[in-house]
Amino acid sequence: MNTIKKQIEWDKYIIALSPIFLIFYISNETYAIDYRAFYLAGKSVLNNLNPYLNHISLSSDFYGPINSELSKFSGWKYPPLASYFFTPLATLPYELSKNIFNLFSLLSISLVTFFIIKKRIFHLNPYSLIIVGISFPFLATISRGQVEILIVCIALISLYFYKQDKIFLSAALIAIMGFIKVFPLLLSL
């Protein structure tokens, strides 16, 4: 009986994760239309303003492609507490804030991928990671500055804690997901 575990070939996975540098470059060069809404909501909270209303009449810093000059509403469609999550990033200039958010998104998905490989939760083909990394849905999610990657990472960590019988931690992470976006709460029912 062979009790020797198969070694993980890390060199293949490191090469497979190389599109992250391309993705970060692309995210640096794009406007991140969806992230702009998060940024403006955080900026509104910092200025004691309602994140759901358009404040462009107060300052051009509140301009976003969604709210423009004519709209009464800002385009913010997330729970009120989500705007508080983005207040630290709203203290920074938009470009720097956007890049930090995208870096955090890329690091979180990389760490979850590393965790899956390390714990051998299931087998990931290294070459499939390259395909996913350069696929249009993934690139579009990053270039627009969407929060779905963070939501998926939090959901996977929550599932891991649930499998480890750490129900409180799992439930707390699901609650955090609900503060950012309501839809994951519906899935957890």
Feature locations, PLM:
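Transmembrane and membrane-interface helices of multi-pass
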Residues: I116, N125-F138, I142
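Hydrophobic core segments of transmembrane alpha-helices in multi-pass, intramembrane catalytic enzymes
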Residues: I109, V147-L156, G178, V182-L185
